[in-house]
């Protein structure tokens, strides 16, 4: 297998095991195009992977993720791994998990839902993880992966 040649980061976050083609969506939902700390963002797409066949990897220099951001990643890449890097070493590594209840991260796809008209925090219950399916607490609309990704 070919060696992956990407420079190491001193401080920051590496998001690994993103399904091939979804790395750009991870960058979009984390708003990494608007970084103001001067840190580099690296996207490796369609990289060979024993586990997935092909995968994407996102490296973010000088930035660590909040719990809400990790939950957003779980909706796009439920099997992703997050690596926290300090002084060029992995100091923490964990798999993302889709929470049972998703609050304030996702918009409801139902234009008539109260959350689209009032200042109400959205709330969804996970019905299924594989394939991903959620139900709105307020209007009970069920959304599947494609609609979930469109409403992040």
Swiss-Prot record:
Cellular component GO terms, alphabetical: aspartate carbamoyltransferase complex
Gene Ontology MF: a single term: metal ion binding
SUPFAM superfamilies given in the database record: Aspartate carbamoyltransferase, Regulatory-chain, C-terminal domain, Aspartate carbamoyltransferase, Regulatory-chain, N-terminal domain
Alphabetically ordered keywords of this record: Metal-binding, Pyrimidine biosynthesis, Zinc
Metal-binding found in the keyword field: yes
GO biological process: 'de novo' pyrimidine nucleobase biosynthetic process; pyrimidine nucleotide biosynthetic process
Cofactor: binding comment: Binds 1 zinc ion per subunit.
Essential cofactor(s): Zn(2+)
Keyword Metal-binding: yes
Binding site for Zn(2+): 108, 113, 136, 139
Domain of life: Archaea
Coiled coil: none
Pfam families: PyrI (PF01948), PyrI_C (PF02748)
Family, per entry: Belongs to the PyrI family.
Record-linked HAMAP family: Asp_carb_tr_reg (MF_00002)
Function: Involved in allosteric regulation of aspartate carbamoyltransferase.
Assembly notes: Contains catalytic and regulatory chains.
Name of the molecule in the record: Aspartate carbamoyltransferase regulatory chain
Provenance organism: Pyrococcus abyssi (strain GE5 / Orsay)
């Amino acid at each position: 297998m070919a060696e992956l040649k990407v420079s190491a980061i001193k401080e920051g976050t590496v998001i690994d095991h993103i399904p091939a083609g979804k790395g750009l969506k991870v960058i979009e939902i984390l708003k990494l195009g608007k970084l103001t700390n001067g840190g580099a963002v690296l996207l490796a797409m369609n990289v060979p992977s024993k586990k997935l066949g092909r995968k994407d990897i996102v490296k973010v220099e000088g930035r660590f993720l909040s719990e809400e951001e990790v939950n957003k990643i779980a909706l796009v890449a439920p099997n992703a791994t997050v690596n926290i890097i300090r002084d060029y070493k992995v100091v923490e590594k964990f798999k993302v998990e889709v929470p049972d209840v998703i609050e304030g991260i996702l918009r409801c796809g139902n234009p008539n839902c109260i959350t689209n008209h009032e200042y109400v925090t959205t709330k969804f219950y996970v019905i299924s993880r594989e394939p991903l399916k959620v139900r709105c607490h307020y209007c009970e609309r069920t959304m599947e992966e494609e609609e979930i990704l469109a409403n992040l």
